[in-house]
């Protein structure tokens, strides 16, 4: 790092401290040329990737567009604001953790659909109908049948899960209405 006083190209770190929230490191530095001391603050830079659109164009990630997608899909649906915020954060987290500089918009769309599927099936189908360009009622029917099939599998697995929990000494859902985990 350059010295702020003499512009010498090398300074050494003489002390480092992490902030209380753990997001910043304060470093005390000393210039090897002039001996002046100064402090720097380092923070993590978590850039979101550039989005590659279907037409090949590129644009910076826009959280407002992501929010609009969720809002449109969930319009007039009984989904708590906190749940929507958590879903938004989950999509953004997945984008950051991908570690890519560029991500195709199709990937973002799949992340959104995964979150909507957990939040609200009507919102999921709304989003999927636009995102996947449904052409007719058959496309809607096919998507709804997939959802129903997934729900059926989940319902069939619940008794198996409860039996496994009971065999490990955990009470079932029927005992007190809550999992005893």
Swiss-Prot record:
Keywords: ATP-binding, DNA-binding, Metal-binding, Nucleotide-binding, Repressor, Transcription, Transcription regulation, Zinc, Zinc-finger. Its cofactor is Zn(2+). The keyword Repressor applies. GO terms for biological process: negative regulation of DNA-templated transcription. Residues 49-139 form the ATP-cone domain. Signal peptide: none annotated. Binds 1 zinc ion. InterPro entries: ATP-cone_dom (IPR005144), NrdR-like_N (IPR055173), RNR_NrdR-like (IPR003796). One of its GO terms (molecular function) is zinc ion binding. A zinc finger (unnamed) spans 3-34. Belongs to the NrdR family. Negatively regulates transcription of bacterial ribonucleotide reductase nrd genes and operons by binding to NrdR-boxes. HAMAP family: NrdR. This is Transcriptional repressor NrdR.
